Amino acid sequence: MLAPTGRSRILQIHPTRRCNLRCLHCYSLSGPNQREELSEELLCSAVEDASAEGYTVVSMSGGEPLLYDPLRAVLDKAHQCGMVTSVATNGMLLDEKRLNRLQGSIDLLAISVDGIPTAHDKMRNNPAAFKTMANCLPYVRQSGIPFGFIFTLTQHNLRELPWVAEFALNQGAQLLQIHPLDEVGRASECLNGSSPDTDDNASALLAATQLDAHYKGRLKIQLDLVSRNMLMEDPKRYFAHQQNDSWEDEPLSELVSPLIIEQDGAVVPLQYGFSRDYAIGSLYDAPFSTLAAEWKDNKRRSFGDLCQRGHKEITSSNTRLHNWYSTVSQLSCVE
C-alpha cells in the first residue's frame, strides 16, 4: 500500500501548461492562458529513446493533457515501444467524443478528486468542477478504460478520505491514490503551510490501512509515502546505495525513476520542479539518448550522493513516514 517508488520505471511527461482550470495546488502554474507545449515529434522521439533506456511506463500529466492535441500520437508511440500508458486528468473534459478518440491508447485514467464536492470545487477554483467531472464518469465507464482517482492530501481534508473512497468504489474505480500536497508552484502561494505534517501522515496511514481492509481488494488504496524502515531495508530501490563503475553500463532507468519531462523540454529526476543542477538536460539541446549518456558520465554520481543524503536524513530521524520525492527535491534546491 505504501508505494512512492514502485518497481516500474516511469517516464512522466508534462506536455503542456494549458489547462481549463487554475487549481490552487497546481505545481506547474498551469491555466487557461498558458500556451507552452512540446511538439509531437520531440516527445515521440524521447519516448522511443526512453524505452531503449529501460523505461516501461509513460504517464501523461499537465496542464490538462486532454487539451494537448498530439496526446494520442504520443500514447500510441509508447504502446509501439511496449510501454504501459496512463493519463492524469481533472476529468472535466472526458466526454464521449474524446474518449472514443483515445480508445485503445490509454491503459489507465487517473482522475483528480480532492474531497467532498464543495472542497473539490474550492481546490479546483471552479464552482462546477466536481459536477462536471462526475457527469463525465458514465462515459468513462462506458469506454471500458480502467480508471482510478487521485486524492491530494492536505492538513485539512483527511476526514474526507472515507467519503472519497466510497465515491471511488461506487463509480467503478480500481484505484485510489493518496498523494501528499507538495507546496510548489501555485500551491506555495495559495496553500502555504497546508502540507500534511507528521501527525497527518500517521493518521493517513491508519485511515488508508483501515480502508484497504474494509474494501478487501475491491478498491486498491495507495499512499504515496515511504516508511523509514523501507528505506533502511532497501536503499537501492530509492537510488540511495553506493554506486560503482559497474553501473556505467546500466540503462538510465536503473539510475533514476521516475524521470520527468517538463513543458519547457527539461528532463529532471523524480519530481516536477527538481533542481536543474541534476537535470538530464533539455530535449531542445540534444536527443534524449545523448542527454542520457552525458548524464551518466557527468551527473550520475552527484545524483546518487544526493539520494544518499536524503536517505541519511530520513533514516536518522525519529519520524516513521516520509514523502521521499519531496525530501530529495527540497535537498536538491537548497545546495
Report residues per predicted region.
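Flexible mid-to-C-terminal extensions adjoining Fe-S/redox cofactors in radical SAM and related proteins
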Residues: 1-3, 7, 266-335
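Conserved alpha-helical substructure of the radical SAM core
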Residues: 1-101, 105
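Short cysteine clusters
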Residues: 19, 23-26, 252, 270, ...
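Hydrophobic residues within beta-strands of alpha/beta enzymes
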Residues: 26, 58, 109, 176-179
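Conserved beta-strand edge residues that scaffold enzyme active sites
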Residues: 64, 92-93, 115, 154-155, ...
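Short, well-ordered alpha-helical microsegments
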Residues: 68, 94-96, 158-161, 268
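Radical SAM enzyme [4Fe-4S]-AdoMet core and its adjacent flexible, acidic
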Residues: 81, 105, 112, 122, ...
